[in-house]
Amino acid sequence: MVDRLADLRFDGLELGGFKPHPNPDDLATGEQRAAVRERVAEAGMAFSGLAADLWSQKLINTTDTTDYIRCFRKNAQFCVDLGIRTIRVDCVQPPTILAEVDEESARRRVVQTWKRCSQEAADKGLWVTWEFEPGFAFNKPSDILRIVDEVDEDNFGVLFDACHAHMVAAVGARQPGRKETLPGGAVELARRLRGKINHIHLIDSDGTLHDNETSTHAPFGEGELNFDELLPELNKAGVPHDWWTIDLCFWPDAWAVTERCKKAVDELNRKYGG
C-alpha cells in the first residue's frame, strides 16, 4: 500500500488504527513502531492522522468513561511514536442511543470526556479532531457547534469531511426528532465552523447513506458537491496544517478510483491550495 500510494505521488496516508492495519496493540514495542514510521518515511511520505479504534468503548451510555479515556491515552502514545500529530475521535454510538439516554446528560458526558482527552493530548503535542457524521450521535449542525464550543480546548476541533457535512447540513440524515438543515448546506456549515476546523477530508456525496448508516463516500464527480464553492470557504477555516485527506471509506474496490480522486484533488490544490 505504501509503495502504491508513493507511486501515485501522495504526500502521506491517514492510518486506521485497527486490524489488519498498524495499531497500538499489534505494535506494542518502540522498535516495531519505529520500523513503521521509517518505512513510510523511506517512501517520502508521512502520516496525516490516526483514526483511533475507540469503537469498542462506551461513551454516551455509561456513567464511567474511564475505559474510553484509557483507550484514547494508548492511541495518543501510538501517535507520538509514529510521528502523527492528529488523533480522530467520534461519538462511538449511533444517534438512536439518544432514545436511551437523555440528550443533556449524553452531551455533557461527551464534552467532559473529550475535554479530558484533549488536555492529555495537548501535553503530547497532539490535535484532537472530532469527525461528526450521520451514523453517530450529535449529528445536527447546532450539536456540532455547541460541543466544540463546550469542549473549549485549543487543540480540539472538528474534522470537516465534505460528504458528512453535506449529509448533515443539507440532507439532515439520521437526525433524531426534528430535522435540522442549513440553507447553504455544507458551505454554510463550514462558514459557521470557521476557526473550529482542524482537519479536512475531501470526497463527494451523492446524497445517500451507505447501508443506511453513514454517508456514502462517492468519488469526485459522482456526487452533488460544488468544490469550487466549498474550497474557498475551507481556506478560511484556519486549519493548523496543510493536509487534505481523500476519504473513500466503504467504497467498493477503492483502489480502482484512487488515482482519479488524486487527480481531482491535485486540480483543486492547483486552484485553491495555499
Give short role names for the model-derived ranges.
Residues 1-86, 115, 153-157, 232, ...:
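N-terminal pre-domain/capping segments
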Residues 30-34, 62-73, 100, 104-112, ...:
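Non-membrane alpha-helical structural segments and their capping/turn regions in soluble enzymes
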Residues 18-32, 56-66, 94-99, 134-140, ...:
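Acidic-and-aromatic substrate-binding clefts and catalytic sites of carbohydrate-active enzymes
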Residues 13, 50, 115-219, 224:
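Acidic/histidine-rich catalytic cores of soluble enzymes
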Residues 41-42, 58-160:
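Active-site acidic/histidine proton-transfer and metal-coordination neighborhood
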Residues 202-204, 243-251:
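Short acidic/histidine-rich active-site segments
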Residues 223, 230, 235-237, 242-246:
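H/E-rich (His + Asp/Glu) clusters that bind or coordinate divalent metals
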Residues 14-15, 47-52, 85-92, 126-131, ...:
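Short beta-strand segments at enzyme active-site cores
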